[in-house]
């Protein structure tokens, strides 16, 4: 089934008519030319990302230049597994962030965040229950009954490691970003490795995917640019454009609000208009992206630059060449255990 799905997706991307008309602001979709521009921006600002070519000319997408068929970054750390009981450091909750039209659930995306604001963690009292079902007083544990960790001969004091380390400890991932022509947006592929460097069995990669996504939109498929078969976890791009459109719209709204405050003398012009965007993608830090950008050399167009106050209101907070930076923040909400910000360090 996965082979048929992978083959169908490859053929669909290769033979779907290519659009060269930009609809970035209206649909969240990008053209192949815009994908290349966004990839150039990503590799320039974050050198851990690089362009790569297909293994053979027959594997190339004809509408992308040779040598720029996909983007790749390697050795991305992943220190924790996500299972049904995943709660992060202090408990996490999954919240559906709806699209700007407030439509069906499929038009939104899940985000993980601290649950302390809505469901405080509480320590429950432990009491004894006798055979008749009567609840007794709280039982006090005698300190003498606690195993001594320094007692090598005490079998109770020994902490035994689990025999199977495939689902524990540090993993690393190689991440790939391709262009999905059928959906006119990027697509993420992920290939995992165990702490000893051995390839991670494909089904175990699902342990690093947020539950609702791995049940619905994440599949195991062959990477289309390799001559040999390599199974990877892939986030299906069917909803990427609508999610990106929502993120872009909210970034624009945040920028517009800040400009209005600045005109009223209530704000500073030093920060970039990303507040709404950051909030909607689980408050992930994007400061590194525009901190590097504002240091553009004199005479050059500043990356992530603030738009002058006298420009038209239709100016946007995020340019199309910055698209993949935002895309990676969205993907980070799908795989919160994978340290995507590691790939965005200089």
Swiss-Prot record:
Keywords: Autophagy, Cytoplasm, Protein transport, Transport, Ubl conjugation pathway
Cross-referenced Pfam families: Autophagy_act_C
Coarse class of the protein's main subcellular location: cytoplasm
BP GO annotations: autophagosome assembly; autophagy of mitochondrion; glycophagy; nucleophagy; piecemeal microautophagy of the nucleus; protein targeting to membrane; protein transport
Annotated region (Handle region), positions in chain: 242-322
InterPro entries in the record: Atg3/Atg10 (IPR007135)
Coiled coil stretches, renumbered: none
Any Gene Ontology CC annotation: cytosol
Flexible region: annotated span: 85-161
Any one GO MF annotation of this record: Atg8-family ligase activity
Compartments in which it is found: Cytoplasm
Catalytic site: 238 (glycyl thioester intermediate)
PANTHER family per the UniProt record, alphabetical: UBIQUITIN-LIKE-CONJUGATING ENZYME ATG3
Free-text comment on this protein's domains from its UniProt entry: The N-terminal region is involved in phosphatidylethanolamine-binding and is required for apg-6/atg8-PE conjugation.
Known partners and oligomeric status: Monomer. Interacts with apg-6/atg8 through an intermediate thioester bond through the C-terminal Gly of apg-6/atg8. Also interacts with the 40 amino acid C-terminal region of the E1-like apg-5/atg7 enzyme. Also interacts with the atg12-apg-4/atg5 conjugate.
Task performed by this protein: E2 conjugating enzyme required for the cytoplasm to vacuole transport (Cvt) and autophagy. Required for selective autophagic degradation of the nucleus (nucleophagy) as well as for mitophagy which contributes to regulate mitochondrial quantity and quality by eliminating the mitochondria to a basal level to fulfill cellular energy requirements and preventing excess ROS production. Responsible for the E2-like covalent binding of phosphatidylethanolamine to the C-terminal Gly of apg-6/atg8.
Entry similarity comment: Belongs to the ATG3 family.
Protein name (Swiss-Prot/TrEMBL): Autophagy-related protein 3
Gene from which this protein is expressed: apg-3
């Amino acid at each position: 089934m996965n082979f048929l799905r992978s083959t169908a997706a490859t053929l669909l991307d290769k033979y779907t008519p290519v659009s060269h008309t930009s609809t970035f602001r209206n649909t969240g979709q990008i053209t192949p030319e815009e994908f290349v521009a966004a990839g150039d921006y990503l590799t320039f600002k974050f050198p851990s990302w690089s362009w790569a070519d297909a293994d053979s000319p027959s594997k190339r997408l004809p509408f992308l230049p040779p040598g720029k068929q996909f983007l790749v970054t390697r050795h991305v750390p992943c220190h924790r597994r996500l299972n049904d009981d995943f709660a992060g450091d202090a408990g996490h909750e999954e919240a559906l962030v709806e699209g700007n039209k407030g439509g069906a659930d499929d038009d939104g995306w899940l985000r993980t965040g601290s649950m302390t604001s809505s469901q405080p963690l509480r320590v429950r009292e432990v009491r004894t229950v006798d055979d008749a079902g009567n609840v007794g007083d709280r039982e006090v544990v005698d300190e003498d009954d606690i195993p001594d960790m320094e007692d090598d001969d005490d079998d109770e004091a020994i902490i035994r490691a689990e025999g199977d380390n495939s689902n524990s400890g540090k993993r690393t991932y190689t991440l790939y970003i391709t262009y999905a022509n059928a959906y006119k947006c990027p697509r993420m592929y992920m290939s995992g490795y165990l702490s000893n460097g051995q390839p991670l069995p494909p089904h175990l990669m699902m342990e690093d995917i947020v539950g609702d996504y791995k049940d619905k939109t994440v599949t195991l498929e062959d990477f289309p640019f390799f001559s040999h078969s390599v199974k990877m976890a892939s986030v299906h791009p069917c909803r990427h454009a609508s999610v990106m459109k929502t993120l872009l719209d909210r970034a624009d709204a945040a920028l517009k609000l800040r400009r209005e405050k600045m005109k009223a003398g209530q704000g500073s012009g030093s920060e970039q208009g990303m507040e709404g965007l950051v909030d909607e993608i689980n408050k992930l830090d994007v400061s590194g992206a525009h901190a590097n950008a504002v240091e553009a050399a004199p005479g050059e167009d500043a990356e992530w630059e603030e738009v002058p106050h006298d420009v038209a209101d239709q100016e946007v907070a995020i340019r199309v060449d910055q698209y993949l930076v935002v895309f990676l923040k969205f993907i980070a909400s799908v795989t919160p255990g994978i340290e995507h910000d590691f790939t965005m360090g200089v």
